[in-house]
């Protein structure tokens, strides 16, 4: 097993133990049949080895070596309702008996669309897809057709799916940022034609005045502004005062569409997503992950005026598996679960998330570790600060890169994993509706041991 040269060898002391023997064996076997051994590139980054799992239940998951974890990765946020909820499994099973796919219409798609209309402030009309990446592409096409303009404005460091257009400006290296006033349009992948970059404008997050200047400099050319209401994919940065209202104002003033990417935030902070939580109504909304509870399902929802080109048929939106009945059955169960919880829905994840954040910060202080959790609670990022880095909230991508200590976080995560606490490799944590007080209490006990080990090993190195 090769250890990445990006990190010192002591970062992964667990790699030679037997705790992950079966996962290592399967990963080695997979590389003979699966390109790079994984089916999503980011999974290969997991240390000490990409783990293989056998089953999950509620807030817990078990790997093939029999190790149990309190799961705060929770399917990269898709499993808002926890692992293997019985009602959802039953709904999928009952639908499978009736048919797995028709490439036609069924009543379920109307029922799910009607539930989205009930929940989401901006959902006058709905179209279904299989992934949020597809929805992003559909939203961009629709915005350009609606306005007759070529450019999409997005924020530096933001992730909007893995396709060519979604990755523009995602996590650019510091030596290629460009000027603060004019962030460089970069792409992290080879194989993308240069013309794609020319159809985007990049602005810095959480600077309304800067955003105004960028929009004014491209007046009449921008079709839409796309954004995560809380930038969960990059340090869980909440919008500062005035940012969302400025986006709405500029879109109304210049005839641009406001596109909220609620792939992660949808249903997580409130039944109506971040748009309910923060109090705004976008023109188009991208939904994924929790809308399907772990099955491949996504939706584009929006105002009727913004969806008009699809209604007319002048914008192509198609797909053999769009509105798949198995996925619709799962989504109907998920949305009914959210509706049934009512006002209790946000409190469950919010309260537990805040407790976990506070507990992790207290343990960090106890062990002299510069870990600073930030975010709303149902999703948050545990930021490991570099020596001498400033305290306080991180509010934009450049500040995040300057202040984070990625190798040290990776070491701490391996220590947490050994204790049975699973968070996302880059520092993101999710609270599901299946987590309970016992999970938080137990996770903090385990984290105490992990923090102690990390502090000792990091100091010794």
Range-by-range predicted roles:
Residues 1-15:
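N-terminal amphipathic/basic-hydrophobic helices that include classical n-h-c signal peptides
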């Amino acid at each position: 097993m090769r250890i990445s040269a990006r990190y010192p060898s002591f970062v992964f002391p667990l790699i030679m133990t037997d705790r992950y023997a079966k996962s290592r064996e399967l990963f080695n076997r997979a590389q003979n049949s699966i390109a790079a051994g994984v089916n999503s590139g980011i999974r290969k980054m997991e240390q000490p080895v990409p783990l293989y799992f056998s089953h999950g239940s509620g807030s817990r998951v078990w790997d093939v070596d029999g190790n149990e974890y309190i799961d705060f990765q929770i399917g990269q946020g898709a499993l808002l309702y926890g692992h293997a909820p019985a009602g959802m499994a039953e709904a999928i099973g009952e639908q499978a008996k009736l048919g797995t796919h028709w490439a036609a219409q069924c009543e379920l798609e109307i029922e799910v669309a009607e539930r989205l209309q009930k929940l989401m402030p901006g959902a006058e009309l709905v179209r279904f897809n299989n992934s949020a990446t597809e929805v992003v592409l559909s939203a961009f096409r629709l915005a350009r057709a609606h306005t007759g303009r070529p450019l999409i404005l997005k924020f530096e460091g933001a992730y909007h799916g893995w396709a060519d257009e979604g990755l523009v400006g995602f996590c650019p290296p510091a030596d290629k940022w460009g000027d603060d006033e004019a962030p460089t349009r970069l792409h992290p992948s080879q194989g993308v034609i240069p013309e794609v970059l020319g159809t985007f404008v990049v602005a810095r997050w959480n600077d309304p005045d800067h955003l105004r200047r960028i929009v004014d400099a491209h007046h009449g050319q921008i079709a839409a502004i796309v954004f995560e209401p809380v930038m969960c994919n990059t340090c869980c940065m909440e919008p500062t005062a005035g940012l969302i209202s400025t986006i709405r104002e500029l879109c109304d003033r210049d005839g641009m569409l406001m596109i909220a990417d609620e792939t992660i935030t949808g249903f997580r902070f409130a039944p109506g997503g971040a748009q309910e939580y923060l109090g705004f109504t976008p023109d188009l909304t991208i939904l994924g992950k929790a809308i399907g509870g772990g099955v491949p399902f996504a939706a584009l929802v929006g105002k009727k005026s913004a969806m008009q080109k699809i209604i007319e048929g002048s914008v192509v939106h198609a797909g053999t598996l769009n509105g798949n009945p198995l996925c619709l059955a799962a989504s109907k169960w998920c949305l009914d679960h959210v509706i049934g919880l009512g006002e209790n829905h946000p409190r469950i994840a919010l309260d537990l998330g805040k407790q976990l954040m506070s507990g992790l910060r207290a343990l960090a202080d106890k062990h002299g570790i510069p870990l600073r959790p930030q975010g709303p609670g149902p999703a948050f990022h545990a930021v490991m600060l570099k020596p001498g880095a400033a305290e306080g909230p991180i509010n934009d991508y450049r500040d995040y890169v300057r202040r984070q200590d990625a190798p040290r976080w990776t070491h701490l995560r391996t220590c947490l994993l050994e204790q049975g606490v699973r968070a996302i490799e880059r520092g993101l944590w999710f609270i599901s509706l299946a987590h309970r007080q016992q999970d938080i209490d137990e996770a903090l006990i385990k984290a105490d041991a992990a923090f102690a080990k990390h502090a000792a090993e990091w100091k010794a190195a």
